[in-house]
Amino acid sequence: MKQKELWINQIKGLCICLVVIYHSVITFYPHLTTFQHPLSEVLSKCWIYFNLYLAPFRMPVFFFISGYLIRRYIDSVPWGNCLDKRIWNIFWVLALWGVVQWLALSALNQWLAPERDLSNASNAAYADSTGEFLHGMITASTSLWYLYALIVYFVVCKIFSRLALPLFALFVLLSVAVNFVPTPWWGMNSVIRNLPYYSLGAWFGATIMTCVKEVPLRRHLLMASLLTVLAVGAWLFTISLLLSLVSIVVIMKLFYQYEQRFGMRSTSLLNVIGSNTIAIYTTHRILVEIFSLTLLAQMNAARWSPQVELTLLLVYPFVSLFICTVAGLLVRKLSQRAFSDLLFSPPSLPAAVSYSR
């Protein structure tokens, strides 16, 4: 990767770390029922609320960058040359790891928590039958909904690229509306909610990126401050879109300025993580399930001392992040060396439609 692109990869690395922390928190802290240390319940609630407050910053910049990086395919690459890399590649990973997660999480729950009632779980990974699993995947009710979204977003943005401005306005309205009139499927709600950020990157990303690089924020400090106040006010009324748009610009500006001032190395931790986001994204959910099912049984039975309990509640998301990151990188390395990266890169489509590398 060229040096000038490293800061973008660093942002991708940060985003996937926040995603891992998000899943680590929601699968653990809300399900605790027993607290021994007087600060344990407070600390658990702090993690839950901290996770909630990160929502406007976690996925929007991730999707903006995803859209920005494929704008060439939107503008100038024929459909036939897009099928392999932009659709088939992602569909393969979505389908393969959707099945892997389903089999793994079903087995883990039968083994570690056979008494757990999953009848009302709306995640394809907890499906009782093949039909339920397929329904969950089709409606984006899966922990892998990000991959589902990438396929849908690309197709929509490429087909309607000549109607970018009016459609972007429509996507903004849909993103706001889904907060008040959601669909029956939580994953589809997330897909609709994040559509403006991807389309913004795909259609207008080049212009925005130029502004991020060339326009100093201090020259427009008053306007930026007023916009931030307005964004926070809207967020308090459950409309996070404006705050997310502001966060995209601020996060990119900070990382770009950091690279310009201090430089970035391709071997830095965030860059390595950013280069392997799909591997970490697809594998971490299985590990998080193992951690939560194992620890919840011990914590709710009060089998550890109050001091151990409090320490675990304090550091668990960071420990989970570390293990999931290392595991994801190892699985990617194994995939490359033992399976020609088949776990994350599909067999090529027939030559007639394959993307020319």
UniProtKB/Swiss-Prot annotation:
The chain crosses the membrane at residues 13-33, 50-70, 87-107, 136-156, 163-183, 197-217, 232-252, 311-331. Pfam families: Acyl_transf_3 (PF01757). It is found in: Cell inner membrane. Residues 1-12, 71-86, 157-162, 218-231, 332-357 are cytoplasmic. Residues 34-49, 108-135, 184-196, 253-310 are periplasmic. Keywords: Cell inner membrane, Cell membrane, Membrane, Transmembrane, Transmembrane helix. GO terms for molecular function: O-acetyltransferase activity. Belongs to the acyltransferase 3 family. This is Inner membrane protein YcfT.
